[in-house]
């Protein structure tokens, strides 16, 4: 066969015929079929050669997309059923009363004052009679955990019952919070926690006096405390476990007590007086009534002695709208200044002081902020204090690992972070620190005068 015949046959093949040229979609489909075929063969071969692949757990479960409505509904329904089942496993009020009756019946003499006690033998007897739901509480580990210094080897019935009550409450609360966990990943987003607190308000007698028009501001005030302290990386979500582990939820649910003292309400961030105080301060600062705070308006916060340099940094680093601060950003500012001993608050202020974004404060940073304090002292007719003296005092207080740099961890470890930050940002705070000995002496004299009378 000569080359002309070979060429003629080649040109006549269906693959090269213009009329039968494959479309782009057909080529993609063919490529996908081949990929699937070879991938399946390879996967099958690997599975047969290595049995360990059967025991490796699955690490990733894809969440349903927004357009996969059926999968979303199925996931929500299955989670609801699971949480209902978990809820039924908890002790109800009647079962708790029965447990208390059994414990009281099996107490082991002698009593210590009015404290009823129980030994391990009777402890196990109560566990057998209390039912399957209580089995998890009647273990040697729990008994040993509550065993202290009793010479008869007993534990307090009241302490054990409180332990059970606390465990039941934690599980109930976990289930309640999980109902708002839309993604089912063990986290609550800001909107999830807002919904939880909004639906919780009617169950808290101490909040009965709040007008419904204030609910949105109250919810914002409450939620910000959770996120400010529990979400330091600002991911927009916090673990349900972290919510349960901290005291904030206890403070919030304390508002169920109808006889809560005035002092307790004043120190509780979640109380109605506290929320109204914070919101009232915001309204008082907002002189132009546009719902936002400018730098000039914020400068009147507290004793109105914060430096302009510090306020400049606040508006440079914090989220603002056309150069003004909204209520949510203001709440972070208040939480930081009112809790300066806390690591989360120090992290907030440290970021503002770290003007070079180096992760530490050096002599330049300290001098940059203290110069503004010196200027305010001149304006108020006070003699400026030498920066060198203040700088030496700060480094002596903090005792950083590096003698020329102060890190955030150095501030936290020193337990002097609140004092150091106050010295650098607030004239009134610096004056209080500078005259601390005179103030202590004055307090002592006043105390002595009161004792004499």
From Swiss-Prot:
Q: How does it assemble?
A: Interacts with MCM3AP/GANP. Interacts with PPP5C, and the phosphatase 2A core enzyme composed of the PPP2CA catalytic subunit and the constant regulatory subunit PPP2R1A. Finds in a complex with ABCB1, TFPI2 and PPP2R3C; leading to the dephosphorylation of ABCB1.
Keyword Repeat found = yes
In which domain of life is the source organism classified?
Eukaryota
**Organism listed in the record:** Homo sapiens (Human)
Q: Which UniProt keywords apply?
A: Calcium, Cone-rod dystrophy, Cytoplasm, Deafness, Disease variant, Metal-binding, Nucleus, Repeat
Which residues take part in binding Ca(2+)? 286, 288, 290, 292, 297
> Which Pfam families does the UniProt entry name for this protein?
EF-hand_13 (PF17958)
Task: Name the associated disease, please.
Answer: Myoectodermal gonadal dysgenesis syndrome: An autosomal recessive disorder characterized by 46,XY complete gonadal dysgenesis and extragonadal anomalies, including typical facial gestalt, low birth weight, myopathy, rod and cone dystrophy, anal atresia, omphalocele, sensorineural hearing loss, dry and scaly skin, skeletal abnormalities, renal agenesis and neuromotor delay.
Cellular component annotations (GO), alphabetically ordered? actin cytoskeleton; centrosome; cilium; cytosol; Golgi apparatus; nuclear body; nucleoplasm
| InterPro entries, A to Z | EF-hand-dom_pair, EF-hand_13, EF_Hand_1_Ca_BS, PPP2R3C
Gene transcribed to yield this protein: PPP2R3C
The EF-hand domain sits at 273-308, 341-376
Q: What is this protein called?
A: Serine/threonine-protein phosphatase 2A regulatory subunit B'' subunit gamma
Q: What exactly does this protein do?
A: May regulate MCM3AP phosphorylation through phosphatase recruitment. May act as a negative regulator of ABCB1 expression and function through the dephosphorylation of ABCB1 by TFPI2/PPP2R3C complex. May play a role in the activation-induced cell death of B-cells.
SUPFAM superfamilies given in the database record: EF-hand
